[in-house]
Design a protein with these regions (language model features):
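N-terminal periplasmic accessory domains that precede
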Residues: 66, 96-99, 115, 134-135, ...
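Outer-membrane beta-barrel translocator/receptor signature
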Residues: 159-166, 174-225, 249-252
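Outer membrane beta-barrel strand-and-loop segments of large Gram-negative receptors
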Residues: 367-370, 520, 526, 537-595, ...
Length: 737
């Protein structure tokens, strides 16, 4: 570690002419720990030199401090992976979305779509505050992130159905400062995207404030084909929609955040976020379908325009209420206005028959979330954490369509949807010499209501669920570097609104969606076992699911070629998974690898037979970073998955290889990162095949993920700790650690 300190020296009285030259050529080398260096960097240094007759007094005062260090980017603590962002190349990649693309253990499967290897899509938190509807991937800057914590085994503290958790811990300024930073990310794929933004930050005493503005234009072009096969008694109907799906969006986002640190143990955060987005999607399709006697060609143009305005108010409080007690409280309230216009224009090439429909969907969401956590100590060295969560969604929706096949009640209706989930949890934990154990449970009560008014009818329905979801963990550390752990967790999959809606919504002339009022909740019990020896972790995970809810597509009427998509309770399923991860530093090179092998056990009905999903599949992630110098870092991230089966879904193999170079220039004022994504052009996670009853449907084609991304961030000004010197002469003292 090298600390360069610009020093002002002042001579008060001397007769020795050579002392000046000696002081200006002074080069001090001191070995210290990182903690010592941090403390010294905050203190003015006074040095006194004396001669026999006269004395020389000079002040050494710090103007700027440059710290260069290397440490492992990621480490494992129990079931949690901690990724150090501050001080690494990850903190210089622009925004959170750019950072997650290069983060070890994370797979990118689509635009702002990320998965934890072996666990699936995570739930996001920022400083412990649950993220609900905000777009954090472009608004949170990577330079403001201290670390991210990836929890692979979320317990009763988190909402039911949480596969994994990513908690983003931001940096808290320690000194009075003011800064203005500019950012821009330009991405060149089939279509060009750009995200310029600026962030103004100020810290004075106990108050910290920031104002961020983001403008984003995003373009995406997927080239894929949707297919459907219906097995009739005497023939097979097949349709293929060759589709160019072009989506373009424009958004403006303003975030105003304030932190008040009343004391080192009490912090209040207030955040306001406004987001405006216009999105246009254009599908140009050639539809080919074959029935018993003929082949029909149709030209289809589908357009969707969406206008969204969102206002979000967030609050969180963290405080120490006693010697061994802590309180965390967060609240989040969003108002979302969403207006969607959808058109479908179908023209038969042979007969020139045209079928045009217009659908309007105007809705307003009110979304409120409150989370509470309280840690305290009990007798017999037992630690306890209790808390709760309240989640409320109120959705008012007006739906109208001109589709010819829709019935009178289906053509227009007004819907009011309410979903309330109240939860409370309690966790008890105890530590012995080398054993840590935790046991707890989460109780959740849900109340879902729907009220639909059509032209001629009114419909009301409600459903309540009440569930207790236990969890337990044991960690045994027989010696340093060796750790064994076991976890158990139960989660629930609720029916939601589709479990109450009786009406159908037509997508086009050959398909529609429908609700299912007969749905039951699904439950999953997961047992996990891990062994860690230094940098190597091995794991085994078993899960059993009852009544899992999945969307299926089938043909309910053999006299037509129209398919229906609806949610159903599937048969019981089992999953066996073997997990391995390894992290190691080799000088300037850091490697992180994660791999998972999964064996499913599931059966479903297709073409009158019972089909079994039992093929072994693999997925993984390999990450390399090389510290070239204090100014340049090279990195690469490779994610892969093999052919895999999940319930009645089959997904083809896919991979995503990215590589990049990150540079810090102009005394760290300018950061540049150049990233190449989907280098092999194999990140086609949209190659899917669904089978159920008499119908097979899915997609094949290519995603728009291959391209080049250039991210820039520039600090216009940043006033940190500054101590004025007392002499005009300046010198650099190098401290090497």
């Amino acid at each position: 570690m090298v600390l360069q300190k610009y020093v002002n020296l002042r001579h008060l009285n001397t007769k020795q002419s050579n002392i000046n030259d000696k002081l200006l050529l002074m080069n001090i080398i001191v070995r210290r720990t990182l903690l010592s260096a941090s403390i010294l960097s905050l203190m003015p240094i006074m040095a006194n030199a004396q001669t026999d007759k006269d004395s020389v007094n000079y002040d050494l005062k710090l103007d700027t401090v440059h710290v260069t260090a290397r440490r492992p980017i990621i480490k494992t603590e129990g079931s949690k992976d901690i990724v150090h962002v501050k001080g690494s190349y990850l903190g210089k990649l622009g925004n959170l979305g750019n950072m997650l693309v290069a983060t070890p253990g994370i797979s990118t499967v689509g635009p702002n779509m990320y998965e934890v290897v072996g666990k699936g899509a995570p739930k996001y938190y920022v400083d412990g505050r649950e993220v609900t509807s905000q777009d954090i991937f472009k608004t949170i800057k990577s330079s403001n992130i201290d670390r991210i914590e990836i929890e692979r085994e979320p317990g009763g503290k988190y909402p039911a159905g949480t596969n994994a958790v990513i908690n983003i811990i931001t940096i808290r300024p320690l000194t009075d400062r003011i800064s203005l930073d500019l950012y821009n990310t330009a991405t060149f794929k089939r279509k060009v995207s750009e995200n310029p933004s600026f962030e103004f930050k100020a810290n004075k005493g106990v108050w910290t404030s920031s104002l961020t503005y983001d403008y984003a234009t995003f373009g995406n072009l997927n080239k894929e084909t949707y297919f459907t096969e219906i097995a009739h008694p005497d023939y097979t109907f097949r349709s293929d929609e060759s589709n160019n799906n072009y989506m373009r969006s424009f958004s403006h986002t303003v975030t105003f955040a304030n932190d008040i640190n009343f004391s080192p143990n009490h912090r209040l955060s207030l955040v306001y976020n406004y987001a405006h987005e216009k999105e246009h999607t254009n599908d140009t399709e050639t539809l080919t379908y074959k029935d018993r006697t003929k082949t029909t060609l149709m030209d289809v143009i589908k357009k969707e325009d969406n206008l969204s305005n969102q206002n979000t108010f967030s609050m969180s409080y963290t405080g120490k209420t006693g010697k061994n007690s802590y309180l965390f409280l967060s609240a989040d309230y969003s108002i979302i206005d969403n207006d969607t216009k959808y058109t479908s224009d179908e023209t038969n090439r042979q007969t020139l028959y045209n079928n045009y429909s217009l659908t309007n969907n105007d809705g307003k969401y009110n979304l409120a979330t409150v989370n509470l956590a309280y840690n305290f100590a009990l007798p017999y060295k037992i630690g306890a954490e209790t808390g709760g969560r309240y989640y409320n969604t109120h959705h008012s929706l007006h739906y109208a369509t001109s589709y010819k096949m829709a019935t009178n009640d289906q053509q227009s209706n007004h819907q009011v949807l309410d979903d309330n989930v109240s939860a409370a949890y309690l966790t008890l934990q105890r530590s012995w010499k080398n054993v840590w154990a935790s046991i707890g449970g989460r109780y959740e009560y849900s109340d879902t209501k729907i009220n639909i008014d059509t032209k001629s009818n009114s419909y009301k329905a409600a459903r309540h669920t009440s569930d207790f979801l236990p969890s337990a963990s044991v960690i045994w550390t027989p010696k340093q570097g060796l750790r064994f752990q076991a976890h158990y967790n139960r989660s629930i999959q609720r029916q939601g609104y589709m479990g109450l809606v009786p009406f159908s919504v037509y997508k086009d002339s050959l398909s529609y969606t429908s609700g299912n009022t007969q749905l039951l909740p699904g439950y999953t019990d997961t047992y996990s076992f891990y062994t860690t020896w230094k940098s190597l972790t091995l794991g085994f995970i078993y899960s059993h699911t009852t009544n899992e809810i999945s969307n299926v597509t089938y043909n309910p009427d053999q006299n037509t070629d129209i398919v229906c998509e609806m949610p159903l309770n599937m048969n019981n399923s089992d999953s066996y998974q073997i997990f391995a991860s390894y992290r190691k530093s080799f000088g300037k090179l850091f490697f992180s690898g994660t791999a998972s092998m999964q064996i499913p056990r599931f059966s479903y009905e297709y073409l009158g037979k019972k089909c079994k999903a039992s093929k072994v599949s693999c997925s993984g992630n390999a990450n390399l970073s090389y510290f070239i110098s204090s100014h340049f870092t090279a990195f690469t991230n490779f994610s892969f998955q093999s052919y895999n089966e999940r319930l009645n879904r089959i997904q083809k193999a896919a991979n995503n290889w990215m590589a990049g170079l990150q540079a810090n220039l102009l005394d760290d004022c300018l950061s540049i990162s150049l990233t190449f994504t989907d280098i092999l052009h194999k990140a086609n996670y949209n190659n899917l095949d669904y089978r159920y009853m008499n119908t097979r449907e899915g997609t094949y084609g290519s995603n728009d993920m291959r391209g080049i991304s250039l991210s820039l961030s520039y600090s216009l000004f940043n006033q940190n700790l500054k101590v004025k010197g007392s002499r005009n002469d300046q010198e650099v003292i190098n401290r090497t650690m």
